[in-house]
């Protein structure tokens, strides 16, 4: 026993020594890019799309100065950035959603995001969380590596070359699309789909597809991220099986599949065994969401990349897609079986039903109310003493939940909405395509689609903060499809889980409120 305790102490010391603070400088700029061959103005990090890949190790802290150099009067010039999938324990103010966790950062200023990834590892991403700004380009991948990954024996290669982003792309600027959306009530249709920032549209130039290089005999962990504003993708690689192992930064029992649906904001890790003849193979991610009849530029089947074996000629593949087994919710079981709070079918401490309706298109209601952003961030109101819904303005869509409680959320089916919960993972105890509850080993993730069926998930309130729950179709969020959980309000103010509030965060609201509307 003494040896065991000493070993644990030494391991903890080694882990502490290895932990580091990693700094990534983000220059937020307007530049003209043509990821699908059509040149347009963009809002991007460091002049590139997708944005800079952030790579750290489990236990590290992150420091990201954001230098807002936006100048274009045709797009939003203020900004906020969400670090999607991170719990932000004690740093709810760094989570990013505008008017939930912070005021937006004005142009010609620098704001530094600082947070610890603590015990988290896996596949994450980041994006603007101000209006629909990320549809203009502010989105990128974020990976936290675990040197002691319990599933690490399944793969040989896991680095920047195996991070794969899936996105849709618009030729029209997001503010203009917003105006069209709110005047017509019709969701905008994208012009093209991109893999790793490259794609094509009907009638456009034959821009080169992205190439993912592999070597025969090696196993590759592909971290596939849907950095989309609306559609979902069906990911596959011709002539190759895939082994699913991670969903939304949570590792699951390995399952052999041929393809997987990945909804907006979801992340999936799959292992590809490069065991086929040396050649070129299509990597496919056809989109669902957006009617091509309403945009002649769109060809959903042109969301392609090339898997190229070492030694293969530099030509496009001639392989053919053969549909196979698609990953099912019922096959997804986290390797850490313990869920949030109480396992088993015992009653939750609090049950919430969210009824979605759209009586006044394009606006959405939840329980009869459409979400409207407050002028003072919800978190700041909590830190100022708000303890009840009536203490928060506006109060209608703020749900106060007590600490250390099991919360069950039920969403009856209504349309296709990938819901994302900030600050937590949740257990999907009733999937939208099932009629049987699973309280033993349900899928665990932070984004799940409500696809016309009854969906129920559970989470445990062990992380005080202000946490958004919203549809990750950006146009639906803009139309009010959201609520906010105000978790353990008093514990945000004082105690061991109280919020860390840097001065530059406190300065954001006065700075933002002082600028003219055209700069907001």
Curated annotation (Swiss-Prot):
Keyword Oxidoreductase: yes
Signal peptide feature range: 1-19
Subcellular location: Secreted
Residues holding Cu cation 4: 417, 471, 476
Cofactors: Cu cation
UniProt: Cu cation 2 binding residues: 84, 127, 472
Catalytic activity: 4 hydroquinone + O2 = 4 benzosemiquinone + 2 H2O
Gene Ontology biological process terms from the UniProt entry: lignin catabolic process
Matches recorded under Pfam families: Cu-oxidase, Cu-oxidase_2, Cu-oxidase_3
Keyword annotations: Copper, Disulfide bond, Glycoprotein, Lignin degradation, Metal-binding, Oxidoreductase, Repeat, Secreted, Signal
Binding site for Cu cation 3: 129, 422, 470
Role played: Lignin degradation and detoxification of lignin-derived products.
UniProt family annotation: Belongs to the multicopper oxidase family.
Protein name: Laccase-2
Name of the gene this protein is made from: lcc2
């Amino acid at each position: 026993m003494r040896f065991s305790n000493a070993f644990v102490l030494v391991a903890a010391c080694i882990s502490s020594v290895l932990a580091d603070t990693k700094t990534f400088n983000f220059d937020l700029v307007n530049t003209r890019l043509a990821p699908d061959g059509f040149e347009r103005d963009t809002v991007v990090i460091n002049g590139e799309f997708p944005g800079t890949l952030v790579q750290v190790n489990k236990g590290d802290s992150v420091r990201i100065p954001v230098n807002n150099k936006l100048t274009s009067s045709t797009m939003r010039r203020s900004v906020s950035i969400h670090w999607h999938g991170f719990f932000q324990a004690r740093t709810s103010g760094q989570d990013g959603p505008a008017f939930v966790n912070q005021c937006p950062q004005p142009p010609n200023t620098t704001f530094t995001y600082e947070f610890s990834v603590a015990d988290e590892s896996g596949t994450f991403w980041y994006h603007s969380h101000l209006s629909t700004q990320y549809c203009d380009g502010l989105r990128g991948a974020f990976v936290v590596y675990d040197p002691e990954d319990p599933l690490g024996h399944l793969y040989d290669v896991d680095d920047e070359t195996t991070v794969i982003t899936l996105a849709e792309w618009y030729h029209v600027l997001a503010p203009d699309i917003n105006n069209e959306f709110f005047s017509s009530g019709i969701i905008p249709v994208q012009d093209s789909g991109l893999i790793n920032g490259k794609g094509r549209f009907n009638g456009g130039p034959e821009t080169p597809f992205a190439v993912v290089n592999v070597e025969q005999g090696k196993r590759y962990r592909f971290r596939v991220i849907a950095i989309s504003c609306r559609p979902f993708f069906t990911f596959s690689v011709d002539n190759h099986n895939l082994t699913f192992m991670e969903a939304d930064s949570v590792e699951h029992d390995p399952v052999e599949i041929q393809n997987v649906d990945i909804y907006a904001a979801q992340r999936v890790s799959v292992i590809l065994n490069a065991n086929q003849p040396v050649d070129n193979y299509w990597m496919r991610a056809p989109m669902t969401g957006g009617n091509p009849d309403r945009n002649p530029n769109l060809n959903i089947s042109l969301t392609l990349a090339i898997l190229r074996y070492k030694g293969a000629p530099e030509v496009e593949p001639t392989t053919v897609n053969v549909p196979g087994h698609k990953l099912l919710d019922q096959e997804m079981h986290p390797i850490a079986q313990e869920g949030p709070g109480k396992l088993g079918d015992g009653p939750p401490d609090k049950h919430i039903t969210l009824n979605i309706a759209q009586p006044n298109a394009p606006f959405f209601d939840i329980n009869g109310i459409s979400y409207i952003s407050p002028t003072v961030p919800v978190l700041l109101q909590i830190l100022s003493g708000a303890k009840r819904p009536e203490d928060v303005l506006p109060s209608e869509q703020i749900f106060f939940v007590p600490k250390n409680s099991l919360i069950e959320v039920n969403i009856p089916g209504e349309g296709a909405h990938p819901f994302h919960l900030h600050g937590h993972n949740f257990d999907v105890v009733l999937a939208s395509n099932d009629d049987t509850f699973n309280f033993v080993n349900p899928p665990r993730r932070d984004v799940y689609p409500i696809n016309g069926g009854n969906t129920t998930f559970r989470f445990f309130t062990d992380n005080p903060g202000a946490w958004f729950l919203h549809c990750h179709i950006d146009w639906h969020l803009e139309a009010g499809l959201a609520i906010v959980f105000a978790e353990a309000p008093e514990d945000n103010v004082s105690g061991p889980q109280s919020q860390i509030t840097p001065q530059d965060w406190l300065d954001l609201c006065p700075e933002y409120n002082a600028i003219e509307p055209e700069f907001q």
